[in-house]
């Protein structure tokens, strides 16, 4: 596996960790002051940004025939004979 794919996988994993942390923070935030409103808005912007990074890296990985499972594991889709119905998956 080349460094480009490794980097994309690591960026995706980091983005997903940040998404979880931000979602937890946003759920537990109390907005009472103007500063709280600004901070809440900025947290929402950050969350949207990390979601975009996650989605973009997944799209880049799919373009490299790297697929992600529901368990957040990555696999390389290998076409063994040049036919779309004859494929194998290899865990990364």
Spans of model-derived segments:
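Short, charge/polar-rich alpha-helical segments
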Residues: 1-16
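Intrinsic low-complexity/disordered segments
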Residues: 5, 24, 85-87
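Ordered hydrophobic segments in well-structured contexts
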Residues: 7-9, 21, 25, 75
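Generic structural concept
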Residues: 9-12, 23, 44-47, 51
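Non-transmembrane amphipathic alpha-helical segments
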Residues: 15, 19-26, 57
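Short, charge-rich amphipathic interface segments used for partner binding and complex assembly
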Residues: 28, 34-80
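Short acidic DE-rich linear segments
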Residues: 75-92
């Amino acid at each position: 596996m080349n460094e480009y794919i490794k980097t994309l996988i690591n960026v995706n994993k980091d983005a997903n960790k940040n998404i979880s942390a931000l979602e937890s923070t946003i759920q537990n935030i109390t907005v009472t002051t103007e500063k709280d409103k600004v901070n809440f808005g900025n947290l929402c912007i950050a969350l949207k940004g990390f979601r975009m990074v996650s989605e973009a890296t997944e799209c880049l990985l799919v373009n490299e025939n790297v697929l992600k499972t529901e368990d957040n594991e990555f696999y390389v889709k290998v076409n063994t004979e040049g036919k779309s119905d004859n494929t194998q998956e290899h865990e990364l």
